[in-house]
C-alpha cells in the first residue's frame, strides 16, 4: 500500500487519491443511512448476517469441533458456520450489524483496488503514461457488486496473484509472503481460492514444462498460501474429511440441464456473469474487449497479444465450464463419484472477475498503443464502466426492497417475544412466507433454517411436516428434496416466495401441514407473513397480529394446539 503514494508520477498520485474518494462515495449510503440502508437480501440478509449474529451470541464462536448451536434446528453444528480464524466473524462480534457490514465492505473494496492496481502496474500495464488505465481499471474492479460474505474470496485474487508472480520472478520481498499470510484470514477457500490456487498450480506446471526447470520457490509460495487456508478453514477441512454423519449435501443433485440449455447458459454467463461474482461487464468492458480483438485481427498481432487472447479464451471456457457443470450428461459420473455432487466445482468461474478486469485493462492498453486517436474512446469506456458500476450500488439496485431495519423488524419481534412470555430457549418456532433468518436474528429458536449443510436425518424429519404440501407442488418438492439448503415451511400456494409484505393481499386457503412432528421437535408457534384461513384444520390458533410503521411485515402469530 505504501507504494501507492511513493510513485513519482504526480498525475498518478492524483488519480489514486481520486479513486479512494470515489470508493468512499460509493460506500457513503452505508455510512450515512446505517440500518436504514438498502442492501442485498439473497444470500445476505436472509442468511449470512443472521448467522453472524447467532454465532456471536451463541457462546460457541470458538467452540469445539463437536459443538452445536441450539438456536438453529435444535443444534446446528458449529462447523456449519465460518471459522473463528476468519476476521469477519469478529467484526460482527464486536460491532453492531451495519457497522460490521460497512467495515467489511470498506476492507474488501480498498484491498481489491490496491491488489488490482499493484498487479496491473507490476505485471500487465507497466507504462507510467497509462496510469489512467491501471488506476481506472482497479477502481472499476473495486466497485463491482461482489457477494458481501465472500469478502476477498474473489476480490482478493489480484493481490494474491501479484505476490505469487513476484515470487515466480525471483523477488524475495517480505511483502509477498505477508500478503499470502494475511489474505486467507479474510477470504474463503471454497468461495474462490481453492479454484485460484488450482489454476496457479496448473500455471506452475505449464511454466515448468515450458522452461524445463522447476521453480521451487514459486511452488512453495502456492503451497504456503494453501497451507494458510487449511489452517484458517480447519473446521471445514475436519467436516469434509472426518465427519461420518450424512448431511443435506448428500442429497444435492445438480446435473439436470439439457445440452441446449447448457449452451444458452454458457453465453448468458459469458455476457451477464453470475449473481455471486457480479462484474457488470456486458456493456463497456465487453465493448473494449471486442474492439481490441478486432484491432488484433486487423493487424495480425495474435502472437504479440497472446496474453490477451489466452485470457479471452479462458474466460469463455470458464463460462462453458460453469454452464455444463449442470449438464445432465454428468449423471453417470456423479452417481459413481459422489463428491462431484457435494462439492461445487462449477465455481472455477469465480476466477472470471479477475480475468475480465485484467482483460479490460489489456484491451484499453492495446487500443491506446495501437493509435492515439483511440485515447478518447478508451477514456469514455473506462469512465462509462465506473459510472455504470455506481448505478449498481445496492442503494439503487435494492431501493424497492426492505431496509435492514425494516427487514429484521426488531421492534415487532420484541413485542412477539414479550407476548409469548416464555424464555426463547423453551420453545421452537417456524415461519411461513418469511425468511427464518429474521426470527433467528431476533433470538428465536427456529426449526427452519437456510444453511449450506446440516444433518440429513434432520432434513428427513422436517420433511414430514411439509410432506402434504410438497406432494401438491413438484417444483418445491424437487427444490427441497434435491437441494434442501432452504429447510423452510414450503407451501403450494406460496411456492418459493418468502417476502410477503403487510401490503400483500395473499392468503393461505388450503394449507395442509403435518404438525405432529413439528410439536415433537419442540415447535409451539408459527410466524406467518400471511393470514391462514384454514388454521383450525391444521391445529393452529391465531394468537395475535403484530406490525409497526418501521417494518414491511405483518406477522400473524399462530399457536399450535396438539
Please provide the spans of the model-predicted regions.
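Extracytoplasmic
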Residues: 383-454
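Aromatic/acidic, Gly/Pro-rich catalytic loop(s) in extracytoplasmic/lumenal soluble domains
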Residues: 509-562
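Transmembrane catalytic cores of multi-pass membrane glycosyltransferases
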Residues: 30-87, 152, 186-344, 348
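Start-transfer (signal-anchor) and selected internal transmembrane alpha helices
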Residues: 1-31
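Signature aromatic-anchored transmembrane alpha helix within multi-pass, membrane-resident enzymes
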Residues: 364-394
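Loop-to-helix entry region of an early transmembrane alpha helix in multi-pass inner-membrane enzymes
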Residues: 82-86, 91-114
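Extracytoplasmic/lumenal acceptor-recognition loop(s) of multi-pass membrane glycoenzymes
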Residues: 388-389, 434-505
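Membrane-embedded helix bundles of polyisoprenyl
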Residues: 113-123, 129-209, 220-236
Amino acid at each position: 500500500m505504501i507504494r501507492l503514494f511513493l510513485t513519482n508520477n504526480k498525475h498518478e498520485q492524483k488519480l489514486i487519491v481520486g479513486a479512494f474518494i470515489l470508493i468512499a462515495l460509493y460506500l457513503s449510503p452505508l455510512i450515512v443511512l446505517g440500518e436504514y440502508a438498502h442492501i442485498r437480501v439473497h444470500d445476505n440478509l436472509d442468511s449470512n448476517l443472521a448467522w453472524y449474529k447467532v454465532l456471536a451470541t451463541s457462546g460457541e464462536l470458538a467452540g469445539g469441533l463437536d459443538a452445536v448451536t441450539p438456536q438453529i434446528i435444535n443444534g446446528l453444528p458449529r462447523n456449519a458456520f465460518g471459522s473463528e480464524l476468519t476476521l469477519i466473524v469478529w467484526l460482527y462480534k464486536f460491532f453492531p450489524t451495519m457497522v460490521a457490514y460497512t467495515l467489511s465492505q470498506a476492507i474488501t473494496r480498498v484491498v481489491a483496488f490496491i491488489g488490482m492496481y499493484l498487479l496491473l502496474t507490476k505485471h500487465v500495464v507497466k507504462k507510467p503514461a497509462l496510469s489512467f488505465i491501471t488506476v481506472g481499471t482497479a477502481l472499476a474492479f473495486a466497485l463491482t457488486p461482489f457477494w458481501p460474505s465472500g469478502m476477498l474470496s474473489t476480490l482478493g485474487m489480484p493481490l494474491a496473484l501479484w505476490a505469487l508472480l513476484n515470487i515466480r520472478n525471483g523477488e524475495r520481498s517480505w511483502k509477498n509472503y505477508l500478503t499470502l499470510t494475511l489474505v486467507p484470514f479474510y477470504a474463503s477457500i471454497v468461495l474462490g481460492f481453492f479454484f485460484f490456487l488450482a489454476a496457479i498450480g496448473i500455471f506452475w506446471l505449464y511454466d515448468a514444462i515450458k522452461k524445463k526447470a522447476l521453480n521451487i520457490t514459486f511452488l512453495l509460495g502456492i503451497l504456503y498460501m494453501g497451507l494458510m487456508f487449511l489452517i484458517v478453514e480447519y473446521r471445514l477441512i475436519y467436516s469434509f474429511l472426518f465427519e461420518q454423519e450424512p448431511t443435506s449435501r448428500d442429497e444435492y443433485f445438480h446435473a439436470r440441464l439439457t445440452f441446449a440449455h447448457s449452451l444458452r447458459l454458457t453465453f448468458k454467463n459469458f455476457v451477464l456473469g453470475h449473481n455471486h461474482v457480479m462484474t457488470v461487464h456486458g456493456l463497456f468492458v465487453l465493448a473494449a474487449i471486442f474492439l481490441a480483438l478486432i484491432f488484433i485481427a486487423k493487424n495480425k498481432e495474435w502472437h504479440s497479444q497472446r496474453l490477451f487472447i489466452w485470457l479471452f479464451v479462458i474466460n469463455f471456457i470458464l463460462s462453458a465450464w460453469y454452464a455444463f457443470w449442470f449438464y445432465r450428461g454428468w449423471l453417470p459420473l456423479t452417481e459413481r463419484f459422489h463428491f462431484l455432487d457435494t462439492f461445487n466445482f462449477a465455481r472455477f468461474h469465480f476466477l472470471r472477475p479477475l480475468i475480465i478486469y485484467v482483460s479490460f485493462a489489456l484491451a484499453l492498453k492495446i487500443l491506446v498503443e495501437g493509435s492515439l486517436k483511440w485515447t478518447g474512446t478508451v477514456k469514455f469506456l473506462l469512465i462509462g464502466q465506473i459510472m455504470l458500476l455506481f448505478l449498481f450500488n445496492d442503494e439503487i439496485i435494492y431501493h424497492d426492497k426492505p431496509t435492514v431495519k425494516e427487514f429484521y423488524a426488531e421492534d415487532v419481534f420484541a413485542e412477539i417475544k414479550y407476548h409469548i412470555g416464555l424464555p426463547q430457549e423453551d420453545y421452537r418456532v417456524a415461519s411461513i412466507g418469511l425468511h427464518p433468518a429474521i426470527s433467528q436474528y431476533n433470538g428465536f429458536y427456529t426449526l427452519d433454517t437456510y444453511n449450506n449443510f446440516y444433518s440429513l436425518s434432520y432434513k428427513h424429519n422436517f420433511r414430514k411436516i411439509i410432506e402434504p404440501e410438497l406432494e401438491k407442488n413438484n417444483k418445491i418438492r424437487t427444490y427441497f428434496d434435491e437441494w434442501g439448503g432452504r429447510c423452510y415451511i414450503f407451501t403450494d400456494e406460496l411456492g418459493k416466495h418468502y417476502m410477503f409484505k403487510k401490503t400483500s393481499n395473499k392468503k393461505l386457503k388450503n394449507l395442509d401441514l403435518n404438525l405432529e412432528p413439528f410439536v415433537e421437535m419442540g415447535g409451539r408457534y408459527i410466524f406467518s407473513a400471511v393470514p391462514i384461513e384454514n388454521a383450525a384444520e391444521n391445529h393452529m390458533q391465531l394468537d395475535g397480529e403484530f406490525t409497526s410503521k418501521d417494518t414491511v411485515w405483518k406477522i400473524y402469530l399462530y399457536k399450535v394446539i396438539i
